[in-house]
Swiss-Prot record:
The gene is BZ1. It holds the Pfam family UDPGT. Pathway: Pigment biosynthesis; anthocyanin biosynthesis. It comes from the Eukaryota. In the presence of other necessary color factors, this glycosylation reaction allows the accumulation of anthocyanin pigments. SUPFAM superfamilies: UDP-Glycosyltransferase/glycogen phosphorylase. GO terms for molecular function: anthocyanidin 3-O-glucosyltransferase activity; UDP-glucosyltransferase activity. UDP-alpha-D-glucose binds at T152, A352, Q354, H369, W372, S374, E377, D393, Q394. The active site is at H24, D130. It is an enzyme of class 2 (transferase). It comes from Zea mays. This is Anthocyanidin 3-O-glucosyltransferase. Keywords: Glycosyltransferase, Transferase. It catalyses: an anthocyanidin + UDP-alpha-D-glucose + H(+) = an anthocyanidin 3-O-beta-D-glucoside + UDP. The keyword Transferase applies.
C-alpha cells in the first residue's frame, strides 16, 4: 500500500526465503549478509526464513549464535519444516518433499506473516528467495510484494529447466539413443548434448522430488519473477545462453560468484578455519605443483572408482591434497594413506577450507565433481580442472569447463588410474594443459575485473539492491 500524501514510505522489509537443504541456505545467507550491509542506509531490515535445523547449521558455521556475526538489520526467523513431529528420522528426499508440499499448501504465506511479526509488524515489501522455493511467488503476490528469486547454479542449467517441456517434446523417449546429439534446435543450448542435461529433464525419474521441483520452478520463473539473480559474471556465459535467458527472463541480474560479494575482511575466507593443517602443508609444496581433489559433501565415487583415483594420484607423482569424508578412507588401497603420509607426497583430510586452498599459490589443478560452487571457486582462483560429474547440473558444468570455456578436462564416465594420472599431469605440466592454464588465468582476470571498483558485478549488485529495496 502506498503512503498517503505527505507521509514517508516505511523502510523496506525484505523476507529472504531459503531452501534448507545441501549448501543452498548458506549461499543465500551470504547474499543476505551483503544485501543487509548495502541496504542499511535505507533503513532496510531483512528476515531470513529457514527451518530450525538449517538455522542451527548456519549459526554453527558462521559463529552467529545469539546474533553475533550477523548485521544488525538481519534476523533469523524459524519456519516449520513440514515433517510430522512423530517422524524422527526422515530421508532427505522425503524431507524435501514435505517441505515443498507445506510451502505450496500456503506455508510461505504463513512464513511471511511470521517475518512480519518478528519485525514488529513491518509489512514485507519484497520477497527474495532461493528459486527452488517457487511457491514464494504466489505468497509474495498475495502480500503485494515482488518476488526476486536467486538462482545458485549455472545459467545453462537454468535455461534447461525453463525449456524442459520443449526438450521433452523433442527428445521424447529416445534419450538413450540420442545421448551424443547436440541440442542445436534449442536456443542457448547448442554447446550441450542430450547426455549433459540435468537428471529429470529428458531422462531419469520425472516424479523424483527435485525433478518435479525444478520443472515447476522453470514454469513459474518467466511469468512471476520481478527479477532473477544469476550466479555468473559478464563474459563467462556464451552469448547464446545470455541472449536466450534475456529473452525469457528480461530482468536477469548477474553478480556471481556469490562468495565474492562480502568484503574480504568480512568473508569467512579472510581467516579460514583449517583444523587439519591444509594450508601449512601447502606452504611446503612447489608453486602450482599440487593437485587438489574434492567431490563436495554429497557426491562420492563408488569404491572401485575411489581406488582407481587413489592409484592415479600416486602414479602422477604430483603432490596431492584430497578432501575425503573419513568414512570412505577404509575404501582406499591398502597402504595408500601410510605411503602418502610417510613420503609427504599427499595429504588426505576429512575437510578442507576449499576457497583458501584453491587460492593458495601451490595449487595447480583441481579434480572435482563440477558442482557449480566448486567450478566458480576454481574459476575465481585461476585453477584448471579435471571434472568427474555425477548428477544434477554437474554434467553441463563439466561440458562447459572442457568444451565451452576450455580451461579443463572432463571424464566421460568413471575415472581410471591411467586417466587420472594423465589428467593431473596435463593440467600441471602438459603442453595441451598450457592452454588450459592460460585460459584459467584469463577467466580469473575477468572475475577480478567484474568485482573491482566500477566492475560489472558490483554495478549489477547495486541494481539488485535497488530492485529489492525500491518496492
Amino acid at each position: 500500500m502506498a503512503p498517503a500524501d505527505g507521509e514517508s514510505s516505511p523502510p523496506p522489509h525484505v523476507a529472504v526465503v531459503a531452501f534448507p537443504f545441501s549448501s543452498h541456505a548458506a549461499v543465500l545467507l551470504s547474499i543476505a549478509r551483503a544485501l543487509a550491509a548495502a541496504a542499511a542506509p535505507s533503513g532496510a531490515t531483512l528476515s531470513f526464513l529457514s527451518t530450525a535445523s538449517s538455522l542451527a547449521q548456519l549459526r554453527k558455521a558462521s559463529s552467529a549464535s545469539a546474533g553475533h556475526g550477523l548485521p544488525g538489520n538481519l534476523r533469523f526467523v524459524e519456519v516449520p519444516d513440514g515433517a510430522p513431529a512423530a517422524e524422527e528420522t526422515v530421508p532427505v528426499p522425503r524431507q524435501m518433499q514435505l517441505f515443498m508440499e507445506a510451502a505450496e499448501a500456503g506455508g510461505v504465506k504463513a512464513w511471511l506473516e511470521a517475518a512480519r511479526a518478528a519485525a514488529g509488524g513491518a509489512r514485507v515489501t519484497c520477497v527474495v528467495g532461493d528459486a527452488f522455493v517457487w511457491p514464494a511467488a504466489d505468497a509474495a503476490a498475495s502480500a503485494g510484494a515482488p518476488w526476486v528469486p536467486v538462482w545458485t547454479a549455472a545459467s545453462c542449467a537454468l535455461l534447461a529447466h525453463i525449456r524442459t517441456d520443449s526438450l521433452r517434446e523433442d527428445v521424447g523417449d529416445q534419450a538413450a539413443n540420442r545421448v551424443d546429439e547436440p541440442l542445436i534446435s534449442h536456443p542457448g543450448l547448442a554447446s550441450y548434448r542430450v547426455r549433459d542435461l540435468p537428471d529429470g529433464v529428458v531422462s531419469g525419474d520425472f516424479n523424483y522430488v527435485i525433478s518435479l521441483l525444478v520443472h515447476r520452478m522453470g514454469q513459474c520463473l518467466p511469468r512471476s519473477a520481478a527479477a532473477v539473480a544469476l550466479n555468473t559474471f559478464p563474459g563467462l556465459d556464451p552469448p547464446d545462453v545470455t541472449a536466450a535467458l534475456a529473452e525469457i527472463l528480461p530482468n536477469c541480474v548477474p553478480f556471481g560468484p556469490y562468495h565474492l560479494l562480502l568484503a574480504e575482511d568480512d568473508a569467512d575466507t579472510a581467516a579460514p578455519a583449517d583444523p587439519h593443517g591444509c594450508l601449512a602443508w601447502l606452504g611446503r609444496q612447489p608453486a602450482r605443483g599440487v593437485a587438489y581433489v574434492s567431490f563436495g559433501t554429497v557426491a562420492c565415487p563408488r569404491p572401485d572408482e575411489l581406488r582407481e583415483l587413489a592409484a592415479g594420484l600416486e602414479a602422477s607423482a604430483a603432490p596431492f591434497l584430497w578432501s575425503l569424508r573419513e568414512d570412505s578412507w577404509t575404501l582406499l588401497p591398502p597402504g595408500f594413506l601410510d605411503r602418502a603420509a610417510g613420503t609427504g607426497s599427499g595429504l588426505v583430510v576429512p575437510w578442507a577450507p576449499q576457497v583458501a586452498v584453491l587460492r593458495h599459490p601451490s595449487v595447480g589443478a583441481f579434480v572435482t565433481h563440477a558442482g557449480w560452487a566448486s567450478v566458480l571457486e576454481g574459476v575465481s582462483s585461476g585453477v584448471p580442472m579435471a571434472c568427474r560429474p555425477f548428477f544434477g547440473d554437474q554434467r553441463m558444468n563439466a561440458r562447459s569447463v572442457a568444451h565451452v570455456w576450455g580451461f579443463g578436462a572432463a571424464f566421460e564416465g568413471a575415472m581410471t588410474s591411467a586417466g587420472v594420472a594423465a589428467a593431473v599431469e596435463e593440467l600441471l605440466r602438459g603442453e595441451e594443459g598450457a592452454g588450459m592454464r592460460a585460459r584459467a588465468k584469463e577467466l580469473q582476470a575477468l572475475v577480478a575485473e567484474a568485482f573491482g571498483p566500477g566492475g560489472e558485478c558490483r554495478k549489477n549488485f547495486d541494481r539488485f539492491v535497488e530492485i529489492v529495496c525500491r518496492a
